[in-house]
Amino acid sequence: MQSFKICFFISCLSVVLVKGQFGGTVSSNPNGGLDVNARLSKTIGDPNANVVGGVFAAGNTDGGPATRGAFLAANKDGHGLSLQHSKTDNFGSSLTSSAHAHLFNDKTHKLDANAFHSRTHLDNGFKFDRVGGGLRYDHVTGHGASLTASRIPQLDMNTLGLTGKANLWSSPNRATTLDLTGGVSKHFGGPFDGQTNKQIGLGLNSRF
């Protein structure tokens, strides 16, 4: 497994070293600091059919654990498959495979479906899987919502989550936005059976 992770990371890195494209996001965090996500990627193909490989890193300007990893993805006509490996300091590592399918898009409303499986190895030795899927809706004005269901079989825990986003302001090129976000999730079974989590926030986000 370790050798696969090393080969996977080297493959992604070798792809992006040839005219890689750098980009990312900076977002305000209600708990302090700024969340910074950066990635270097290379796309082969066109907008309708392509293969993308890259490396990424994420962290907060106030400190805390940083995450880094690599990914590969193949897309065609709005459908796609992806594979990602990530490592978070003082937490563990995850290998995630996912698929998404385009269901509807009339240039104003967009609806997509997705499914995923992740395998996480914690630094303390505990390993667990997470499988699930969901639906995501996006409006051309920047509003959106998503519904996700997942299961961790090792804990016999199922989770249902709903999130939403309302765009309050956007720059002319839509690279910077002010969004109101909220979400609610509930656990069924496992150590958090019956627990409901709610969150709401106001965030400034910028793409570079």
From Swiss-Prot:
The name this protein goes by in its record: Attacin-A
Keyword vocabulary terms for this entry: Antibiotic, Antimicrobial, Immunity, Innate immunity, Secreted, Signal
Known tissue expression: Hemolymph and fat body.
Function of the molecule: Hemolymph antibacterial protein against Gram-negative bacteria.
GO CC list: extracellular region
Pfam families: Attacin_C, Attacin_N
Source organism: Glossina morsitans morsitans (Savannah tsetse fly)
Swiss-Prot/TrEMBL induction comment: By bacterial infection.
InterPro entries according to UniProt: Attacin_C, Attacin_N
Family of the protein in this entry: Belongs to the attacin/sarcotoxin-2 family.
Keyword Metal-binding: no
GO biological process: antibacterial humoral response; defense response to Gram-negative bacterium; innate immune response
Classification of source organism: Eukaryota, Metazoa, Ecdysozoa, Arthropoda, Hexapoda
Subcellular location: Secreted
Propeptide: 21-47
Predominant location: secreted
Domain of life, per lineage: Eukaryota
Annotated transmembrane regions: none
Annotated signal sequence range: 1-20
